[in-house]
A protein has these predicted regions:
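Extended beta-solenoid/beta-helix repeat architectures
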Residues: 1-104
Length: 104
């Protein structure tokens, strides 16, 4: 996994673990697993049957009809159309997710 910068939008067409920065939107195609450890400066669109795992930062929204898991930070919102799981200590739209024994 090399650290790199992509200027503009990016389409993930094959499984990938990314470290670095993408200055535009990211589209995760159907059947693809995209694991982000870096920064995405705009939105993430996850197509149906696509998988997005965020350990880094997304400065926009995560939307689409696929699956998303968040460990890191999403400055925007998570679309209600997505199948999502937000892990403890993740931050979405300024809110840190914390779980207590009563919520599990």
């Amino acid at each position: 996994m090399e650290n790199r910068k992509i200027d503009g939008n990016y389409v993930a067409k094959a499984d990938e673990r990314f470290m670095g920065m993408i200055t535009g939107n990211v589209t995760v195609k159907s059947g693809v697993k995209f694991i982000n450890h870096g920064m995405i400066c705009e939105n993430v669109i996850v197509e149906e049957n696509g998988f997005f795992y965020n350990h880094g930062m997304v400065n926009g929204n995560i939307m689409g009809e696929g699956y998303a898991e968040v460990w890191g930070v999403v400055k925007g919102y998570l679309s209600s159309m997505l199948n999502t799981y937000v892990h403890q200590e993740a931050v979405v739209n300024g809110e840190r997710y914390e779980f207590d024994e009563k919520s599990i």
